[in-house]
Amino acid sequence: MTQFPQTLRAGATALALVMGLALPAAAGEVIAAVAANFTEPAKEIGALFTEKTGHTVTYAFGPSGQFYTQITQGAPFEVFLSADASRPKKAVEEGYAVPGSDFTYAVGKLVLWSADPARVDDKGAVLKTDLEHVAIADPKSAPYGAAAIEVMQKLGVYETLEPKLVTGKSISQAYEFAATGNAPVGFVAYSQVIGKEGGSSWMVPQDLYKPIKQDAVLLKTGAEDAAAKAYLDFLKTPEALEIIRKYGYVTE
């Protein structure tokens, strides 16, 4: 069985002390596994959550499939914010999460993006040109990668592009491949490029891929943790929803 470090909780407390946060006596800590595409909004939400409640959050960011495997192997996560809806539901079904605690916190959007301002037009025609590489997230563990495959199949370009795919272990790595020029274009989350200057992009039409519903769930390890429950409740507040929408997600 995989062994996980037990220093995450101590690290959160130490960080709070270093930052000079005044934590109330009842303040707690929550350890959250969060899909890589949600990194920036999660950080902003976490800071506001601490400000409002005194509870601290320790985040781990990465591919949802990898997190699910770690959860089944005893990782100390208390909250799971997945990039899909299936894994949180599976966590409930297999006894790793609290029944009835899963909900959709965001619906993601897929974009084809390039660091080159002239590379991608607003119809994605570049996919039918002689591309050297196309970056995507691993479709086996990252829902945005699976969505990218679906798009290419529906456009009839997958067979041509499959040998040219550069696969990142997460959507963050797929973005890095495109941002650094290791791939001229890449399928990334809209949240990763919204508000960024430079580059060019094509917002992939929603009818080319299944909705990327991103669900959160309370894991059994956090079932009795007031901070973990409070964090999930906070995700549903108007303040948190405003942050989520600011990063280009749709909320239900």
Swiss-Prot record:
UniProt: molybdate binding residues: S64, I171, Y190
GO cellular component: periplasmic space
Location in the cell: Periplasm
Single GO biological process annotation from the record: molybdate ion transport
MF terms in GO: metal ion binding; molybdate ion binding
Alphabetically ordered keywords of this record: Metal-binding, Molybdenum, Periplasm, Signal, Transport, Tungsten
Annotated transmembrane regions: none
Superkingdom in the source lineage: Bacteria
SUPFAM superfamilies, per database record: Periplasmic binding protein-like II (SSF53850)
Main location: periplasm
Signal peptide: 1-27
InterPro entries: AvModA-like_subst-bd, ModA, ModA/WtpA
Subunit and partners: The complex is composed of two ATP-binding proteins (ModC), two transmembrane proteins (ModB) and a solute-binding protein (ModA).
Family per record: Belongs to the bacterial solute-binding protein ModA family.
NCBIfam families: modA (TIGR01256)
Described function: Involved in the transport of molybdenum into the cell.
Name this polypeptide is given: Molybdate-binding protein ModA
